[in-house]
């Protein structure tokens, strides 16, 4: 159907990554509504299929069908985690959104892949966004407390949980709640944390390490790694965050499954220079999903490759300046 709209033949005229620029940009609005089976590749139509949603606070949410991509993404991510702080066989807490979201099942698979069991809480991010937009701050505080209480209960129930996922906001609130109860994230046994969300800034990271954890990993015994991802991309890992680099956070996509470029605000096919600012552009190339260029709602600076990830990265990720004021962050 789309092929008939193109001015080139994608079957014969796409021979390199550069050739993907011939395609028009992918529009995520196409993901609203059904039937979702139109997104299932013919070769996978008999595979068990999941559907994950993003957004949906108002109107029809965007949906992505998945067979095994969420497993593969997190298995690859698993191999970047240091076993010293994410011990094989240890249990996990998923302190993030529940419901029709990829993240919950993905973290559960990550725990199982590493030989552990994942515990989770009930958290509806759509309700959080509605509370913020309505200005119901008292209700918002009670709902946050309700979510954190669930996490504290799990962590203090003797489940031998050493690893967890949390968004920055929820991790901050969890540490505060534990402190109010006379304990800490370290004392309840957590040694490894992977986190992600738009609140992940160098300033917050420094505060978290110095104030919430009590010092760097060598001193606190707690290792935290930032991540950047979504339903369409998968998971981008970060370069190790250090005080020497002023807690700068640089993300690297899981090539070749996904490629992140920082492109000019005026020309989405023009990659900016290293250190320059631009919009984040995503290309996804798995056997389940083909996205030949999608402009994320984020901007950042282009980063140089390094030893672990020998391809371009992006730092300073934040909401795209033209829509930043209209973006409600919620639990992320």
Regions found by a protein language model. Give the residues of each.
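Conserved AMP-binding loop of ANL adenylate-forming enzymes
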Residues: 82-124
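Short, compositionally biased "basic patch" segments
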Residues: 43-58, 108-127
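A glycine- and small-aliphatic-rich helix-loop capping segment at beta-alpha/alpha-beta transitions
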Residues: 69-73, 111, 182
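Nucleotide 5′-phosphate-binding alpha/beta core
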Residues: 1-100, 153-156, 331
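Short, well-ordered alpha-helical packing segments
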Residues: 78-82, 108, 175, 209
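Short, charged/polar "capping" segments at the starts of alpha-helices
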Residues: 1, 101-104, 201-203
């Amino acid at each position: 159907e789309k092929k008939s709209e193109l001015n080139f033949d994608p079957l014969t005229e796409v021979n390199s990554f550069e050739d993907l620029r011939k395609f028009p940009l992918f529009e995520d609005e196409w993901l609203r509504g059904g039937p979702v089976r139109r997104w299932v590749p013919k070769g996978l139509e008999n595979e068990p299929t999941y559907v994950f949603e993003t957004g949906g606070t108002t109107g029809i949410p965007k949906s992505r069908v998945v067979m095994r991509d969420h497993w593969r993404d997190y298995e690859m991510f698993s191999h970047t985690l240091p076993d010293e702080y994410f011990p094989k066989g240890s249990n996990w807490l998923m302190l993030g959104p529940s419901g029709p979201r990829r993240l919950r099942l993905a973290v559960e698979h990550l725990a199982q892949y590493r030989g552990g069991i994942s515990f989770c809480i009930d958290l509806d991010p759509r309700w959080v966004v509605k509370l913020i937009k309505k200005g119901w701050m008292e209700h918002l505080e009670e709902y946050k407390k309700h979510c954190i209480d669930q996490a504290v209960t799990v962590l203090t129930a003797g489940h031998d949980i050493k690893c967890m996922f949390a968004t920055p906001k929820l991790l901050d609130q969890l540490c505060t709640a534990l402190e109010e109860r006379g304990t800490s994230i370290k004392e309840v046994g957590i040694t490894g944390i992977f986190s992600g969300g738009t609140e992940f800034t160098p300033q917050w990271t420094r505060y978290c390490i110095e104030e919430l954890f009590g010092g760097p990993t060598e001193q606190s015994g707690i290792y935290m790694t930032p991540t950047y991802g979504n339903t369409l991309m998968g998971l981008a890992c970060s370069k190790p965050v250090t005080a020497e680099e002023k807690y700068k956070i640089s993300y690297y996509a899981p090539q070749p499954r996904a490629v992140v470029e920082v492109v000019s605000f005026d020309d989405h096919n023009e990659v900016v220079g290293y250190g320059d600012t631009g919009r984040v552009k995503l290309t996804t190339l798995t056997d389940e999903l083909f996205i030949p260029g999608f402009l994320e709602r984020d901007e950042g600076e282009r980063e140089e490759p390094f030893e672990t990830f020998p391809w371009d990265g992006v730092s300073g990720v934040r909401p795209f300046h033209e829509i930043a004021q209209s973006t409600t962050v919620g639990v992320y």
